[in-house]
UniProtKB/Swiss-Prot annotation:
Intrachain disulfide bonds: none
A GO CC term attached to the entry: cytosol
Keyword Protein biosynthesis tagged: yes
Matching Gene3D superfamilies: Formyl transferase, C-terminal domain, Formyl transferase, N-terminal domain
Top-level taxon of origin: Bacteria
InterPro entries: Fmt (IPR005794), Formyl_trans_C (IPR005793), Formyl_trans_C_sf (IPR037022), Formyl_transf_N (IPR002376), Formyl_transf_N_sf (IPR036477), Formyl_transferase-like_C_sf (IPR011034), GART_AS (IPR001555), Met-tRNA-FMT_C (IPR044135)
Function: Attaches a formyl group to the free amino group of methionyl-tRNA(fMet). The formyl group appears to play a dual role in the initiator identity of N-formylmethionyl-tRNA by promoting its recognition by IF2 and preventing the misappropriation of this tRNA by the elongation apparatus.
Keywords: Protein biosynthesis, Transferase
Organism: Hahella chejuensis (strain KCTC 2396)
Name assigned to this protein: Methionyl-tRNA formyltransferase
EC number: 2.1.2.9
Length: 318
């Protein structure tokens, strides 16, 4: 019987914490956790540990937080753990070849897409915006390129019409934990089979930018709706009404035709605020006024604020 794998885990946000929890539940020996340095957060701008660090401390696992691995001292510290494998999930720090080569069996990455589609930083949101019918988890052997390594295991989930960036993220986070537990079991039995990625099929999920969330009403309603879903909970789509920023949390799209200028409010009811788009009509069902919380259209009408009024033309550009 083979000896238990000594695992280093590297990750930072909630997505990674789900994978670490799955490994702990499966009784894997986590010899160290690597995570990004604590960041200022909250009203007091105090340094707060991320979800992965909090979980590691709860289980008394050694935590390392190098800024990067340019320092030989940091690279040697990692080697000193003598890990069999390093599991990486949304770590947020580029790993040089010296780190990738340090564990006996290299580094395995939990990536939230079906590679080679959506390599890069924001695969969940890009899949929703593109109208993909499915997403999933790829466990891959890491190499120097951006998400270019051999694929070791894949699991698939459909993307439903109701999915948002949050719901798909949470589902993939759970799937990622299940997939890495399975992958490590296969690794220990020498049963993992590597499949090279087809580079000509690769697409890139560029990092999200806040300005992307500004709604361009000249776009098709269906595309705007997918962006609203993808950018929930961040950065949240927004538009402007008389210079005031209105955040849009939920909406549906229809192919209804309108001759009105894109951005024109066509209907304002307790059910929805309907807006003309470049193609079709967007029905907004949840929005957020300046300084407030997300509300329904019924709350908008009852609130009596002179915003999102019938006939108003919402701004397309800044």
């Amino acid at each position: 019987m083979s000896s238990p794998l000594k695992v280093i885990f590297a990750g930072t946000p909630d997505f990674a914490a789900s994978a670490l929890q799955a490994l702990l539940d499966a009784n894997y020996q986590i010899v160290a956790v690597y995570t990004q340095p604590d960041r200022p957060a909250g009203r007091g701008n105090k340094l707060l540990p991320g979800p992965v660090k909090q979980l590691a401390l709860k289980h008394t696992i050694p935590v390392e937080q190098p800024l990067n691995f340019k320092n030989e001292e940091d690279r040697q510290q990692l080697r000193d753990y003598e890990a069999d494998v390093m599991v990486v999930a949304a770590y947020g720090i580029i790993l040089p070849q010296a780190v990738l080569d340090a564990p006996k069996r290299g580094c395995l990455n939990i990536h939230a897409s079906l590679l080679p589609r959506w390599r890069g930083a924001a695969p969940i949101q890009r899949a929703i915006i593109a109208g993909d019918q499915e997403s999933g988890i790829t466990i891959m052997q890491m190499e120097a390129g951006l998400d270019t390594g051999p694929m070791l295991l894949k699991t698939v989930t459909p993307i439903s019409a109701d999915d948002t960036g949050r719901t798909l993220h949470d589902r993939l986070a759970q799937m990622g934990g299940e997939a890495i537990v399975k992958a490590l079991a296969l690794l220990q039995e020498d049963k993992l089979q590597a499949e090279r990625q087809q580079d000509d099929l690769a697409t890139y999920a560029h990092k999200l930018q806040k300005e992307e969330a500004r709604i361009d009403w000249s776009e098709p309603a269906s595309l705007i709706q997918r962006k609203i879903a993808a950018f929930n909970p961040w950065p949240v789509c927004f538009t402007e009404d008389n210079g005031q920023t209105i955040r849009i949390w939920a909406a549906s799209a229809s192919a209804d035709m309108s001759k009105a200028k894109p951005g024109t409010i066509l209907e304002r009811s307790a059910e929805a605020v309907k807006v003309a788009c470049g193609e079709g009509v967007l029905s907004i069902t949840s929005l957020q006024l300046p300084g407030g919380k997300p509300i329904s259209c019924k709350d908008l009408i009852n609130g009596g604020k002179p915003l999102m009024q019938l006939g108003q033309v919402l701004e397309i550009t800044s």
